[in-house]
C-alpha cells in the first residue's frame, strides 16, 4: 500500500501516520536494509548506519525520504517533526514498527523524557521563532488541547546558553560596582568564553 504524502516539507507537523505502508515481510523484499534496521530498532540495537539507512525527509536520503514511505508507520518518529515524539507522540511512541533513531533510543533508555507528558495522537498547533521552532506545541489528547512548554533544562544547548547569560550578568554587575584597582576587575567576557573552550 502506497503512503503518498501531501507535503514533503522538512519538519512539517503531520497530523497522523495512519497509513501502515507495506507489511514487514513486503518491506523485507523491497527494502531489506531498512527492514533489518527496523528489526534492530525494535531490539534497541540500532546504529548510526541504521539511522542513515532509514533517513528522513529532512535528511533527503534513506527509506523515509521516499514518497511511498514518508507517511508510513515506519517513519512516524523521524518524519513527524514533533517535539519529544519518542516520548509523547502515539504513532511513534506506541508503535514498535516506527523506527527510533539512536538519539531516540538514548532518550528512552536514559529516561530523559520530560515529566508529565501525555501520550497524544496528533499535534494541533505549534509555534516559536528562529532556531527554537519547538518553543511550544499543542497536543491533541483525547480531544483536549494540551499546550506543552519546553523546560529549558531539558535542552542541553539552551542550558549552556542560560549559564553563559548568567555569567555575563554577574560580570556586568561586578564590573559596574567599580573596583578600585585594575587587579580587582574580572577579565573581559571574551577571555572567559575562550577559557570555556579549553574544557
Curated annotation (Swiss-Prot):
Transmembrane regions listed in the UniProt entry? 150-170
Q: How does it sit in the membrane?
A: Single-pass membrane protein
Q: Report whether Hydrolase shows up as a keyword of the record.
A: no
Give a GO biological-process term.
symbiont-mediated activation of host autophagy
- Can you summarize the PTM annotation of this record? Contains intramolecular disulfide bonds.
Q: Glycoprotein: present as a keyword of the record?
A: yes
Point out the signal peptide segment: none
Report the domain of life of the source organism: Viruses
An annotated GO cellular component? membrane
Task: List localization entries.
Answer: Virion membrane; Host membrane
- Residues annotated as glycosylated are 131
Q: What is its induction?
A: Expressed in the late phase of the viral replicative cycle.
Identify the main location: virion
What are the entry keywords?
A: Activation of host autophagy by virus, Disulfide bond, Glycoprotein, Host membrane, Host-virus interaction, Late protein, Membrane, Transmembrane, Transmembrane helix, Virion
Q: Which family does it belong to?
A: Belongs to the asfivirus E199L family.
The annotated subunit structure for this chain is: Interacts with host PYCR2; this interaction results in autophagy activation.
As for what it does, the entry says: Essential for viral fusion with host endosomal membrane and core release. Not required for virus morphogenesis and egress. Induces complete autophagy through the interaction with and down-regulation of host PYCR2.
In Swiss-Prot or TrEMBL terms, this protein is called Inner membrane protein E199L
Organism (species): African swine fever virus (isolate Tick/Malawi/Lil 20-1/1983) (ASFV)
Amino acid at each position: 500500500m502506497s503512503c503518498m504524502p501531501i507535503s514533503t516539507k522538512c519538519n512539517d507537523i503531520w497530523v497522523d501516520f495512519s497509513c501502515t505502508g507495506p507489511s514487514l515481510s513486503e518491506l523485507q523484499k523491497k527494502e531489506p536494509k531498512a527492514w533489518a534496521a527496523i528489526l534492530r530498532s525494535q531490539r534497541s540495537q540500532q546504529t548510526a548506519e541504521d539511522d542513515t539507512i532509514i533517513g528522513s525527509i529532512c535528511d533527503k536520503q534513506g527509506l523515509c525520504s521516499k514518497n511511498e514511505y514518508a507517511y508510513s508507520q515506519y517513519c512516524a518518529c523521524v518524519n513527524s517533526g514533533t517535539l519529544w515524539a519518542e516520548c509523547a507522540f502515539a504513532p511513534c511512541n506506541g508503535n514498535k514498527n516506527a523506527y527510533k533513531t539512536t538519539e531516540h533510543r538514548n532518550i528512552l533508555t536514559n529516561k530523559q523524557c520530560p515529566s508529565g507528558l501525555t501520550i497524544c495522537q496528533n499535534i494541533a498547533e505549534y509555534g516559536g521563532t528562529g532556531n527554537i521552532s519547538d518553543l511550544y506545541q499543542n497536543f491533541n489528547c483525547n480531544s483536549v488541547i494540551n499546550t506543552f512548554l519546553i523546560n529549558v533544562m531539558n535542552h542541553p544547548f539552551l542550558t549552556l546558553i542560560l549559564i553563559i547569560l548568567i555569567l555575563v550578568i554577574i560580570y556586568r554587575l561586578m564590573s559596574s560596582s567599580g573596583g578600585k584597582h585594575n587587579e580587582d576587575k574580572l577579565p573581559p567576557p571574551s577571555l572567559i568564553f575562550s577559557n570555556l573552550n579549553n574544557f
